[in-house]
Amino acid sequence: FGTSGQAWTVKGQLVGDGKGGNPYAPDRSDHFPLESQKNTYSAQLFQKAANEVGYKPYNLPSANTSGPYTNPYGAQMGPCNFCGFCSGYVCYMYSKASPNVNILPALKPLPNFELRPNSHVLRVNLDSSKTRATGVTYVDGQGREIEQPADLVILGAFQFHNVRLMLLSGIGKPYDPITGEGVVGKNFAYQNMATIKAYFDKDVHTNNFIGAGGNGVAVDDFNADNFDHGPHGFVGGSPMWVNQAGSRPIAGTSNPPGTPAWGSAWKKATADYYTHQVSMDAHGAHQSYRGNYLDLDPVYRDAYGLPLLRMTFDWQENDIKMNRFMVEKMGKIAEAMNPKAIALLGKKVGEHFNTASYQTTHLNGGAIMGTDPKTSALNRYLQSWDVHNVFVPGASAFPQGLGYNPTGLVAALTYWSARAIREQYLKNPGPLVQA
């Protein structure tokens, strides 16, 4: 990955004076490949304020390179230059970890590797017993439907589409929220977001157009089991951070509460605050519930005539309690910055999920791993309980939503699964865990 970061301890030994590391992090077996990226001014303000209120800020590890890096596959990465066009954009510096940068260059020269771009898989094909996959059917760039035979099928199509492909292919029993039976589509979990924006005078230059996707400063004081939940009446937790990834001219427009939504006053406020504000977020954990699930839509279909995936979801009391608690704790950091104005963007009591505003793409569940085929779709190696030559890596395997973004653990779990495939399954195809 070329991850930039600062460890707190390595093999039980404190790294340096601990500055920049996360005191709540588990012990590491090795240092990060690269040192932490430089902090933006917004991150420096957050770090100073967090220290003042008694929290323990640390540099966010980021899959953006702080310097040149060559990974174990021989793939080369250049240093991130904080261009600000990171999230949602291809990196022209090769500074952002992704399969096309970190793995594909090593695969291309291999004689047994073929990449077929512009392909859309419609379903996994099963034999007459419905216990073995025979391949997949896909549509190519010319719109032709093609059947690709295969001895092994790996679904790595993002959380939503992994679940949809399993449902469309008849792999695993669909979840029924009324009876609680079935496994595919259950345990769908979101991410419980809260945001605070602090607005400053023109002499505080945060220059939000500068940024790197994963760079920032965070506190973990209220994440996971790092604090006593007892008095607060909820489970779960959240890191809080300033992650200045770059702010596009329109999407990044944000003005203090009370600013008119249009007209000359809005234009003036936009000019006054565009480069003089700090945005901080809590990316909170989210628990799965019986009534939050995924299934095939009975009405709406895609361009190929196949049912779309339907998401049935709403916030629950625990989610709102946790969210409001995080806003309160994060608000102390904002107040310590002494801004002109503060906007608190948290959930209200009784609030429902709103599909009109973007919140996060860090989704979990729907094809979860477990120890029992009656309650999970996959075993510990991400192998389907029902169709042994289908493996499904992705955040779809997580039964609950984490207090961190899932990407790092998705990658680790995928390597775990790939090793089991290579060292166990290919030598003796069949279930790797006996039900």
Q: Where are the regions a protein language model picked out?
A:
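Short, solvent-exposed loop/turn and secondary-structure capping segments
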Residues: 6, 62, 68-72, 126, ...
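Glycine-rich loop(s) and the adjacent beta-strand/alpha-helix scaffold that form part
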Residues: 110, 119, 123-211, 394, ...
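A glycine-rich dinucleotide-binding beta-alpha-beta segment and adjacent secondary-structure elements
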Residues: 82-86, 122-127, 275-286, 291, ...
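Conserved, non-catalytic sequence blocks in retroelement Pol enzymes and Pol-derived host proteins
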Residues: 36-38, 94, 317-322, 357, ...
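Short, glycine/acidic-rich hinge or "gate" loops at secondary-structure transitions
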Residues: 5-26, 340-351, 427-435
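Conserved redox-cofactor binding core of oxidoreductases
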Residues: 1-118, 359
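A generic secondary-structure signal for well-formed alpha-helical elements
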Residues: 1-8, 50-57, 107, 111, ...
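FAD cofactor-binding and catalytic pocket of flavoenzymes
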Residues: 181-321, 360-364, 384-385, 392-399
